[in-house]
Amino acid sequence: MISMLAMAAMVSCTNEIENPDQPQVNQNEPTPIEFGSSILAVQTKAAKTGTAFSDNEIIGIIGFKGDAAPNADYSSPFMDNISFTYATNKFATTNASAVWERNATHHFYAYYPLATTTETNGYKYTAGTASVAPTVSVTVQTGEEGVKQDLLWSNLTSKKFTGASTEFSADKMKLQFAHKLARIAFKVVKKDENVPESALKAVSFKVDYKDASLNLITGELTKGSQITDANKISLSKTLTTAETITEDGSGNATCGDFSPIIIPGTAISDLTLTINEQTLTVSDLSTLTFKEGDITTVTITVNSKGVEFSAAITDWTSTGAGTGTVE
């Protein structure tokens, strides 16, 4: 009996993970990496409501290990564009590479929406190399939405993993995302009660930047080449039922909440409105500016002679660099 117990004890002592640096849960499982999140925003994502993700939304994460964050060689992440899915207030993955390593500092770079090496809905991921950081490229699509999904970015550096999983749980590892693109919105109003009854049917304009690239390590967005007049991207929305234009106040005409996402630094041109079946052009748009994380709302006032405009800029995000927090 004693020899059998001794043998059982020997077996139990060898039932461990081969890599002694990998942390353990219940002595035989690695500790998975999970994240909490928030979005620095008044309005957020393509849906333009809320400051949190919805269940089943997916982000991409690149992860490196080392005392210092990567700044030259980006070719060997331990997590290479791993998809994390949001559910029950946290992001998690089943990918086997997403586990903590004992006594290592981990550096994470996250973005939304998840992209692959094949362009989909205007997004494309390019892995890092020995000298170039990983990137996500974004392309404005012709039509109503511009960029189809809001581009968000965050980074986070952990302290060295000690093996105490409660210190590194999702509610402690929070990714705070920041918006990397810009938005334009429209509000059409009558100057006063003397303007005849009017209805808004459509809004159309063109943009001079089609694409941009986000450095996933630094969070810096770089615009592509400026487009010539002949090749500018047209964005527009036409309503099935025209909206009644009222004096400024509640219930303003917005062309069905037409608010496309565009590249920061874009200049718009050829802004036209269809009002009472007439096409009206808004001129002198050079004063409009579009910055990362901002909504520029263009108020177009209909008067007895035509239209005039003004603009106001509001934060799409709170001020912030999109960095993560470890609590």
Locate each region found by the language model.
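Sec-type signal peptide cleavage vicinity
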Residues: 1-327
